[in-house]
Amino acid sequence: MSVAGRAESLGPPDSFAKRVLVTGGAGFIASHMIVSLVEDYPNYMIINLDKLDYCASLKNLETISNKQNYKFIQGDICDSHFVKLLFETEKIDIVLHFAAQTHVDLSFVRAFEFTYVNVYGTHVLVSAAHEARVEKFIYVSTDEVYGGSLDKEFDESSPKQPTNPYASSKAAAECFVQSYWEQYKFPVVITRSSNVYGPHQYPEKVIPKFISLLQHNRKCCIHGTGLQTRNFLYATDVVEAFLTVLKKGKPGEIYNIGTNFEMSVLQLAKELIQLIKETNSESEMENWVDYVDDRPTNDMRYPMKSEKIHGLGWRPKVPWKEGIKKTIEWYRENFHNWKNAEKALEPFPVQPPFV
């Protein structure tokens, strides 16, 4: 088991009130989650399990890497022997499972890898957590499991109808997680969130990709017409949602984490062009857009109801204009936090950026 950080200065397992395992903690959303937990819960030991895939960066965690209540372990959730040993040695109380392959474009050409990591890896993890009798297991899923809809809003009881390999793998993993509640009453909670944006996100996803392309004087590559719309939620807001679920979420339940803010991909590109290239001219903005072939499937909308988590007291707080400006500034200074980040800027990658 490879351990990094200040492991030698940590107390025994019982010196902390809780021991929280966060998988995929060097990735985008999970790194924000870890920073929040480490800073706000000094009596909790936060253990980051990450295999450091191409989209991960420990630079996301530099502000807390030397904290006494933080520990990094490099490892793979698909390694069942390793995962079982981790639960035995680290005495985990709570699991926040973020680790996954998430790039939709890549899922079309590497579907088996997505199935292996997202489905098998999740099964390994929830099985080990159940055997270790952890207090709570939160599985981080996606609104994409619902499939697309032009008008009907999805609630937590809506059927899963995924339309791409990534979404299918997340839906399948949900079934394994939920089965542990149904069969054993193992305290699992599932979340499904809208598109999240903000610092720390590897620039293969639409917002950091468009920002990075424009900051490198390259055009925004838009799949198809760009009329597909997405709901965008700022990273700190989704962290607050996970904290709410951690504290108040009921075992066996599913919680949508959404926002009413919705924007088409084309409008997103134009707004970023306005902010980064400082132009309001439609003709000039078109010069910074390049239309490329669409994905094999590309859902038009993911409208989602979030009243259930609102009932727990959570609502998004960060306005779009504030969040996007913070995000633009962060990428101006931190684009090279990942190795070979430039390879993420291609319109339709068919190989992982590290190849």
From Swiss-Prot:
GO biological process, one term: nucleotide-sugar metabolic process
Keyword Repressor included in the entry's annotation: no
Active-site residues from the entry: 143-144, 166
Cystine pairings recorded for this chain: none
The keyword GTP-binding appears for this protein: no
Binding-site list for substrate: 142
Cofactor: NAD(+)
Keywords per UniProt: Lyase, NAD
Origin superkingdom: Eukaryota
Enzyme class: lyase
Reaction it catalyzes: dTDP-alpha-D-glucose = dTDP-4-dehydro-6-deoxy-alpha-D-glucose + H2O
Molecular function in Gene Ontology: dTDP-glucose 4,6-dehydratase activity
EC numbers, comma separated: 4.2.1.46
Family (UniProt): Belongs to the NAD(P)-dependent epimerase/dehydratase family. dTDP-glucose dehydratase subfamily.
Stored PANTHER family: DTDP-D-GLUCOSE 4,6-DEHYDRATASE-RELATED
Protein name in the entry: dTDP-D-glucose 4,6-dehydratase
Organism of origin: Bos taurus (Bovine)
